[in-house]
A protein has these predicted regions:
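Short catalytic-loop micro-motif centered on adjacent basic/acidic residues
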Residues: 6, 35-38, 115-117
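A short, glycine/small-residue-rich beta-strand->loop->alpha-helix junction that serves as a flexible
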Residues: 8-20
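Conserved nucleotide-sugar phosphate-binding/catalytic loop shared by glycosyltransferases and other
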Residues: 10, 33-93
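Extreme N-terminal starter segment of soluble prokaryotic enzymes
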Residues: 1-5
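Conserved nucleotide-sugar donor-binding subdomain of glycosyltransferases
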Residues: 77-118
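An aromatic- and histidine-rich active-site surface loop
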Residues: 44-47, 116-128
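A short, Lys/Arg-enriched amphipathic alpha-helix followed by its capping loop at the start of a domain
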Residues: 21-34
Length: 128
C-alpha cells in the first residue's frame, strides 16, 4: 500500500481546492491501493470531515500558523505583533511554529508516508 500525506494550508480556500483536484487525479492515476492522510486546521478540517466522513482517522488537525485576519485581508500590524505576543486568541507566532513543527514531525514519524504533498504548508520543507 502506498501512503500519501497531504498537508493543506488553511488560510483561504485556494489551497484546499487545488489539493482536492490533485487528490482526485492521484486516485485516477495511481493503480493499486493508496492510503491518503490529510492535515490542516479550522475550516479546512471541517470541509475534509464533511467530504470524507468515513475517514476521520486519516484527517489530522495540526495548528498551522496563519496570518491574523484584518478588515480586507491579513492585518500586517497584528501579524507582526503576533511574532512575540499573543494576539486575538493566537499564541505568539514563535510558539505556534515550534508546536506546529513538533506535531507535524510526530505525524511523519507515526505514519511513515511514502509521499508528502503540501500546498502552502512550510513545515514539510523545514523538516526535510
Amino acid at each position: 500500500m502506498f501512503k500519501i500525506g497531504e498537508f493543506i494550508y488553511p488560510w483561504g480556500s485556494g489551497h484546499y481546492s487545488r489539493m482536492m483536484r490533485l487528490n482526485d487525479a492521484l486516485l485516477d492515476q495511481i493503480k493499486g491501493e493508496i492510503d491518503v492522510h490529510f492535515s490542516s486546521k479550522d475550516h479546512v478540517i471541517e470541509k475534509l470531515l464533511k467530504k470524507f466522513p468515513d475517514k476521520k482517522e486519516k484527517i489530522h488537525e495540526i495548528l498551522m500558523p496563519t496570518p491574523i485576519d484584518g478588515k480586507f485581508g491579513p492585518s500586517v500590524s497584528k501579524s507582526l505583533m503576533n511574532i512575540l505576543l499573543p494576539i486575538a486568541n493566537n499564541p505568539s507566532l514563535i510558539r505556534q511554529i515550534v508546536n506546529y513543527l513538533r506535531e507535524e514531525r510526530k505525524l511523519y514519524n507515526k505514519e511513515k508516508f511514502d509521499l508528502v504533498i503540501n500546498d502552502g504548508d512550510m513545515g514539510s520543507n523545514i523538516l526535510a
